Amino acid sequence: MAAPAKAQNPNPPPAATGPIYTLAFFETVAGSHGRTAKLLRGYSAATQGADGNVAILALHEIGRPARFAIIEVWRDKAAADAHAAALGSLRGALRPLLTAPFDIRANSGIDVAGDPVGTEIGAARAVYVVTHVDVFPPGKDQTVEMLKQLAEASRKEPGNLCFDVLQQDGRLNHLPLIEAWRDLAAQNDHATADHTRAFRNKLVTLQGALYDERLYQPIR
């Protein structure tokens, strides 16, 4: 009797090419904002001088003082990989303050325009938004097209400074958004705009997880 055929593994996603967007999220104990911000400023300054770095932005979540994020943009995967040890050192320095481990995700840009994130005119006072869009795999391609349409419309809003659509490496149905707005009022206008509401209404039937939208202010 012949042995049953083994199931074939699906083809792995292609290796990322072009710029790499590293997103890192972490949470700290209450009252540690000052120490955390100091470490992040030092890390940002050092990273700006690293070979292959395009942008680095440290963020503090609005209304959630214990939550932080880091956005790094690298020329390519090799440059991002070369800097991974430095990010590991930061994680080690922050370890006594952490209430949850670092969540680090590598992404590629699928609809990116304008100046690199964090270098926009008005960036020092901007409100940044990082959103994790997670859809069921069969709806990935439809969602990508919807996000491209949303990005095009959102960039035309008067208070928009940045609207980038990313795709997580290895999990192509995970589609982070990076936005920058002139202020909270501009971000609220976007949230209630017709094109945003239409997008959210379509997306809800495709979502594999809650729409995770977080608002931040930059750490300078």
Functional labels for PLM-detected ranges:
Residues 121-162:
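Surface-exposed interaction/gating patches
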Residues 19-27, 55-84, 125-134, 164-191:
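Short, well-ordered beta-strand segments in beta-rich or mixed alpha/beta enzyme
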Residues 2-7:
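Boundary at the C-terminal end of the N-terminal hydrophobic targeting segment
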Residues 27-38, 134-143:
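Short, surface-exposed ligand-recognition loops at beta-strand->loop->(often short) alpha-helix junctions
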Residues 10-16, 42-57, 73-106, 153-161, ...:
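An amphipathic, aromatic/His-enriched active-site/gating alpha helix that lines ligand/cofactor pockets
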Residues 59, 105-115, 166, 214-219:
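Flexible, low-complexity linkers/stalks enriched in Thr/Pro that connect modular domains
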Residues 100-134:
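Surface-exposed beta-loop interaction hotspot
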